[in-house]
Amino acid sequence: MRFAIVVTGPAYGTQQASSAFQFAQALIVEGHELSSVFFYREGVYNANQLTSPASDEFDLVRGWQQLNAQHGVALNICVAAALRRGIVDETEAGRLGLASSNLQPGFTLSGLGALAEASLTCDRVVQF
């Protein structure tokens, strides 16, 4: 089966993103296709490259990045939600006159069209 995941919780502070990541790994292990993960609302914090968890905690931001690098899973970040929460790529930082960007490599700012496309092309969309 082909899956897409929607993550609405931050990397730390709630269980949503961690559960989504574990579910994503289980899908791949079981032979399913995970086409994309769409981060919406507070979920955009999963793409903040400035996140620095304690040394004894799992680094969820880098975990998502590895999922992208190893399995080609698209990591789409809602651009409107990201900008409201201070998550910007180099293009948006330049456009807004900001000193730097903080979007973790492997993630892509995108619109709700990416979520709509995933909904149309996947067998299942699971929200966390």
UniProtKB/Swiss-Prot annotation:
Regions crossing the membrane: none
Main location: cytoplasm
Membership in a protein family: Belongs to the DsrE/TusD family.
Subcellular location: Cytoplasm
Keyword entries, A-Z: Cytoplasm, Transferase, tRNA processing
Active-site residues (renumbered): 78 (cysteine persulfide intermediate)
Pfam families the UniProt entry points to: DsrE
Quaternary structure (record): Heterohexamer, formed by a dimer of trimers. The hexameric TusBCD complex contains 2 copies each of TusB, TusC and TusD. The TusBCD complex interacts with TusE.
GO cellular component terms, semicolon-separated: sulfurtransferase complex
Molecular function (Gene Ontology), one example: sulfurtransferase activity
Protein's UniProt name: Sulfurtransferase TusD
Calcium keyword on record: no
Listed EC numbers: 2.8.1.-
GO biological processes: tRNA wobble position uridine thiolation
Its job: Part of a sulfur-relay system required for 2-thiolation of 5-methylaminomethyl-2-thiouridine (mnm(5)s(2)U) at tRNA wobble positions. Accepts sulfur from TusA and transfers it in turn to TusE.
